[in-house]
Amino acid sequence: MGSFSIWHWLIVLAVVLLLFGRGKIPELMGDVAKGIKNFKKGMSDEDAAAADKSIDGKTVDHKSDEVR
């Protein structure tokens, strides 16, 4: 009872095809792929921006004998 037979999966596949149609499924998968690609690009851009900020850091030396 815990596992599904091949007939169960064929019925599920038929229902999905009826709901979405043949042309809609590749379109949805293409949109998912574009989303993943944009997410990865955004993460790499964010890492590059963080690295640039750490490189641009400046230090200020002060003299300890000066009194305010």
From Swiss-Prot:
Record's protein name: Sec-independent protein translocase protein TatA
MF GO annotations: protein transmembrane transporter activity
Cellular compartments annotated: Cell inner membrane
Function: Part of the twin-arginine translocation (Tat) system that transports large folded proteins containing a characteristic twin-arginine motif in their signal peptide across membranes. TatA could form the protein-conducting channel of the Tat system.
Annotated Basic and acidic residues bias: 53-68
Gene designation: tatA
Domain of life assignment: Bacteria
Stated family: Belongs to the TatA/E family.
One biological process term in Gene Ontology: protein transport by the Tat complex
Lineage: Bacteria, Pseudomonadati, Pseudomonadota, Alphaproteobacteria, Hyphomicrobiales
